[in-house]
Design a protein with these regions (language model features):
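Coiled-coil dimerization/phosphotransfer module
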Residues: 1-133
Length: 133
């Protein structure tokens, strides 16, 4: 997962947007869990590229106390969550639903002309250890 985030940050960084990333205490997790989380991060970065007009974004992923904490921030134009048209909010609603299915929490803080901060907290689903005895 840490390598996937590094690749994603490098792949999506361009002349208009620099994506910084940091991972702390990240290990291998259940494969399905990793795929779901990777897809969520990818969708959020795509939203940043598509809507934010940001010049800098950051991805922070930390494992602490059996939880994964994900923070994605940008310095873009921000938005008023109440003013987002239903069709434009579908991606966010789907992400929220996926996170809740993973028994996690999702929050967005966005301010016009300051940027957006997204926080996700998920219980860790570790790779199963096989016991042959």
């Amino acid at each position: 997962l840490a390598y996937a985030i590094k690749d994603m940050a490098e792949k999506y960084s361009n002349s208009q947007l620099e994506i910084l990333y940091e991972t702390q205490n990240i290990q291998r997790y259940d494969q399905d869990f990793e795929i779901k989380l990777h897809n969520i991060i990818q969708e959020l970065i795509n939203n940043t590229l598509k809507h934010s007009e940001a010049t800098t974004a950051s991805i922070l992923l930390v494992e602490k106390d059996e939880k994964l904490l994900l923070s994605i921030k940008d310095n873009g134009k921000g938005f008023d969550k109440l003013q987002v048209p239903k069709k434009d909010g579908l991606g966010i609603n789907q992400i929220d639903a996926r996170i809740h299915m993973m028994k996690g929490e999702f929050s967005i803080d966005s301010k016009n002309n300051i940027g957006t901060s997204i926080t996700i907290e998920l219980p860790v689903l570790k790779k199963e250890t096989l016991n042959f005895f």
